[in-house]
């Protein structure tokens, strides 16, 4: 989130963060939003009767601020179909810490991804920003990928740190592809 906020503030990205939503209270993204003056909201499953109700409320909040793109970064739920219905026509993208289609799918998040990459003997890893579609996990069209070599002695933590650096640039580059370009005449 911070890289997006910084890119918007510097003018590097001609966009604004309209709202930050989370499915967990107390996460750093909510603190970053508050410091940047961006509204935020939390939609935990404990607060709602089920996943569909939580995701419907989340989509309503996002639509209410006029968002034209939804960016998932650190969001760890599979979005209910109602989310996409409520936000019809609004693209949804996700940041994944591996080179999809490898090392994606259900359960592949956090350190599990980097551990799987290292256990596979892969020579490189990276990150992927991809489109999100209803009831799918890490299967949408790739928007941006960035690569990093696996170094001798890498651990899940050291690899994760290098991939995170790529993620900060990749997400801004991906958002830029959805921002309308103004043509000068």
Model-based region annotation:
Residues 1-28:
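N-terminal Rossmann-like dinucleotide-binding module
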Residues 2-6, 31, 56-63, 169-172, ...:
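Amphipathic, non-transmembrane alpha-helical secondary structure
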Residues 7, 23, 69, 73-182:
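Donor/substrate-binding cores of folate-linked one-carbon enzymes
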Residues 16-19, 39, 91:
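Proline-centered loop/turn at the N-terminus of a beta-strand
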Residues 27-48:
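Conserved nucleotide-sugar phosphate-binding/catalytic loop shared by glycosyltransferases and other
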Residues 34, 63, 118:
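Anion (oxyanion) recognition and catalysis
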Residues 42-67, 72:
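Glycine/small-residue-rich loop that forms an oxyanion/phosphate-binding "nest" at active or ligand-binding sites
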């Amino acid at each position: 989130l911070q890289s997006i906020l910084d890119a918007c503030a510097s003018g590097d990205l001609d966009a604004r963060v309209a709202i930050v939503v989370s499915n967990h209270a107390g996460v750093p993204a909510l603190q970053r939003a508050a410091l940047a003056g961006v509204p935020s909201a939390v939609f935990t499953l404990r607060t709602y009767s089920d996943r569909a109700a939580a995701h419907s409320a989340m989509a309503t909040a996002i639509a209410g601020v006029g968002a034209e793109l939804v960016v998932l970064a650190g969001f760890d739920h599979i979005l209910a179909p109602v989310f996409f219905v409520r936000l019809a026509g609004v693209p949804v993208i996700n940041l994944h810490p591996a080179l999809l289609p490898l090392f994606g799918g259900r359960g592949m998040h956090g350190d599990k991804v980097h551990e799987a990459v290292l256990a596979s003997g892969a020579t490189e890893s990276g990150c992927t920003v991809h489109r999100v579609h209803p009831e799918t996990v890490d299967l949408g069209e790739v928007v941006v990928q960035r690569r990093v070599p696996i170094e001798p002695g890498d651990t899940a933590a050291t690899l994760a740190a290098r991939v995170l650096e790529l993620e900060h640039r990749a997400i801004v580059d991906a958002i830029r592809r959805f921002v309308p370009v103004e043509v000068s005449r």
